């Protein structure tokens, strides 16, 4: 593996420090303006070419279609619920090759799971928990587009309250988004962080930190989805910035070594949540034909309550 930065150091202090050569090829079969693809591109650039991706069935499956895969490295495709088990097999095989001196330690690979929110929040959560319990040395990346985007944007455990999906009526999703960050932290991995591709420096620093550590390291990345959320592809980056600026998507990290949650980007004052919601078709029913003041106030109150608890 390439040399890792010392603890507390970062290569990424300014935008100019971000990689200028991209490892993920262009011309993929993904939807135009895919926020998940943007994040994967940025993550891959920081991790480097010596990476094995283990993909849970989902949107990113479209990247693995032979002979059009844009990855320079290796890719393993698994069913939706078992990507961490696939990562265990890859990690065990690499460790065995190193132990038998068939693979020099400096040529070892990072094992990275790619999974959507359907797998991460739902049917694959038990496999992830078991991998953390075993102390599996891997990076887990959830690209969270807040629904089953690959099959038509049905609601998932990641869908926010009131968002319209293919499985909910005109009033939108009646439930609330599951706090996967807290669930992962409760399992006791080495590192957990939230991120978004629209904040590339923050994302790069977190990927760099995750790569430096050992054990189970988990990244929860919001992935604005023009197809499922209802906005123009060219608005993807702005939607991502608004998710952070309104406080709807907190950027934070937790390390087992410190046991503390640290917020890495805090906007004060925050923009009203409406500025984020009104740009998305999945929330249009909150504004048209009449403004739903009660539900909008409920959503804003939920965001305010979260930040009231942040020191």
Language-model features, listed with the residues they occupy:
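Short, well-ordered beta-to-alpha junction loops that form the rim of enzyme active sites
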Residues: 56-58, 221-224
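Short, conserved beta-strand edge motifs with alternating hydrophobic and charged residues
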Residues: 142, 193-195, 218-222
């Amino acid at each position: 593996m390439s040399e890792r930065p010392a603890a507390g150091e970062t290569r990424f202090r300014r935008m100019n420090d971000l990689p200028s050569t991209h490892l993920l090829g262009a011309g993929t079969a993904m939807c135009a303006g895919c926020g998940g693809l943007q994040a994967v591109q940025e993550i891959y650039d920081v991790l480097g070419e010596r990476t094995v991706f283990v993909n849970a069935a989902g949107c990113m499956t479209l990247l693995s279609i032979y002979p059009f895969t844009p990855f320079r490295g290796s890719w393993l495709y698994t069913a939706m619920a078992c990507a961490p088990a696939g990562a265990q097999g890859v990690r065990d095989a690499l460790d065995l090759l190193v132990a038998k001196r068939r693979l020099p330690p400096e040529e070892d690979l990072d094992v990275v799971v790619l999974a959507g929110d359907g797998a991460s929040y739902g049917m694959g959560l038990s496999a992830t928990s078991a991998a953390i319990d075993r102390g599996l040395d891997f990076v887990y990346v959830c690209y969270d587009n807040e629904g089953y985007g690959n099959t038509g944007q049905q609601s998932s455990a990641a869908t926010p309250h009131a968002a319209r999906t293919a499985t909910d009526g005109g009033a939108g999703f009646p439930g609330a988004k599951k706090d996967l960050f807290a669930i992962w932290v409760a399992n006791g991995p080495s590192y957990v962080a939230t991120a978004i591709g629209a904040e590339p420096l923050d994302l790069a620093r977190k990927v760099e930190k995750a790569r430096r550590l050992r054990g189970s390291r988990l990244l929860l990345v919001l992935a604005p989805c023009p197809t499922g959320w209802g906005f123009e592809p060219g608005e993807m980056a702005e939607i991502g910035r608004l998710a952070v600026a309104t406080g709807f998507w907190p950027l934070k990290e937790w390390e087992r070594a410190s046991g503390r949650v640290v917020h890495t980007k805090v906007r004060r004052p925050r923009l009203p949540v409406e500025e984020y919601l009104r740009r998305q078709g999945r929330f249009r029913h909150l504004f048209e034909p009449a403004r739903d003041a009660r539900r909008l106030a409920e959503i804003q109150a939920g965001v305010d309550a979260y930040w009231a608890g942040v020191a």
